UniProtKB/Swiss-Prot annotation:
Species for this entry: Escherichia coli (strain K12)
Keywords from the named record: DNA replication, DNA-binding, Methyltransferase, S-adenosyl-L-methionine, Transferase
Phenotype on disruption: Cells are filamented, accumulate DNA double-strand breaks, have viability defects at 15 ng/ml ciprofoxacin. A double deletion with priB is seriously disadvantageous to cells.
Name of the molecule in the record: DNA adenine methylase
Consequence of changing residue 137 to L: No methylase activity, binds SAM normally
Residues holding S-adenosyl-L-methionine: 10, 14, 54, 181
UniProt key word Heme: no
Length: 278
């Protein structure tokens, strides 16, 4: 089956893991994603409805605009994907405009440009909340028109929310399945390149996420979580059924260090969850 690509480039995107995720994702009527990111899982599954959330307000605003004003958005965004805009001077002008703009539609248009023309498809903000990714110097950035239209079509059955993982997981009902793709736990104390946006995800939040998953499965709502395979993640997910997968990093802070690392898919499923350890 042909895989559908997201219209955004995204650090930690789940496109390479789709087959593994779909293999272990339980069936249900509604998919809840508290960390939707670029939406690769949403775009490649067939639930009748979706609840998609992220803490990044720019991302959720963009998705709602693409959903509701598709043609207008595609036309406006296409105008920025021309040879004249592919230079550092224009990029930094657009980046400054994005950071100063209060217009949601214009910000959404600029967000796609910055995503495709910026370095490595990163989405990163400084402590003042300003987008600060440098110019990427790509020969000819791709305008994802087909991907935008496919996203907009699928989005008619989706609701997008800018909120915390706890709030979006609270929306799950007995017809729901939850897939969580949190910012990954660091492989080591010095390897935390996973702070992709201003909100760093703490170890306490990682453990809290697992606690919420345990609570949901007690209500017969299955949860699948992806993360690095470390001693900590195995401790957090000790009540889940663990599946180990290898994935090649698609975005790296050092282009020469893209290698396969072990990742975990932790499945909390009624009847499969281990009893709590005393």
């Amino acid at each position: 089956m042909k895989k559908n690509r997201a219209f955004l480039k995204w650090a930690g995107g789940k496109y390479p893991l789709l087959d593994d995720i779909k293999r272990h994702l339980p069936k249900g009527e509604c998919l809840v994603e508290p960390f939707v990111g670029a939406g690769s899982v949403f775009l490649n599954t067939d639930f009748s409805r979706y609840i998609l959330a992220d803490i990044n307000s720019d991302l959720i605003s963009l998705y709602n605009i693409v959903k509701m004003r598709t043609d207008e958005y595609v036309q406006a965004a296409r105008e920025l994907f021309v040879p004249e805009t592919n230079c550092a001077e224009v990029y930094y002008q657009f980046r400054e405009e994005f950071n100063k703009s209060q217009d949601p539609f214009r910000r959404a248009v600029l967000f796609l440009y910055l995503n495709r023309y910026g370095y490595n498809g990163l989405c990163r903000y400084n402590l003042r909340g300003e987008f600060n990714v440098p110019f990427g110097r790509y020969k000819k950035p791709y305008f994802p028109e087909a991907e935008l239209y496919h996203f907009a079509e699928k989005a008619q059955n989706a609701f997008f929310y800018c909120e915390s993982y706890a709030d979006s997981m609270a929306r799950a009902d007995d017809a729901s399945v939850v897939y969580c793709d949190p910012p990954y736990a660091p492989l080591s104390a010095t390897a935390n390149f996973t702070a992709y946006h201003t909100n760093s995800f703490t170890l306490e939040q990682q453990a809290h996420l697992a606690e919420i998953a345990e609570g949901l499965v007690e209500r017969h709502i299955p949860v699948l979580i992806s993360n690095h395979d470390t001693m900590l993640t195995r401790e957090w997910y000790q009540r889940a059924k663990l599946h180990v997968v290898k994935v090649r990093r698609s975005i790296s802070s050092n282009g020469g260090t893209r290698k396969k690392v072990d990742e975990l898919l932790a499945l909390y499923k009624p009847g499969v969850v281990s009893p709590a350890k005393k």
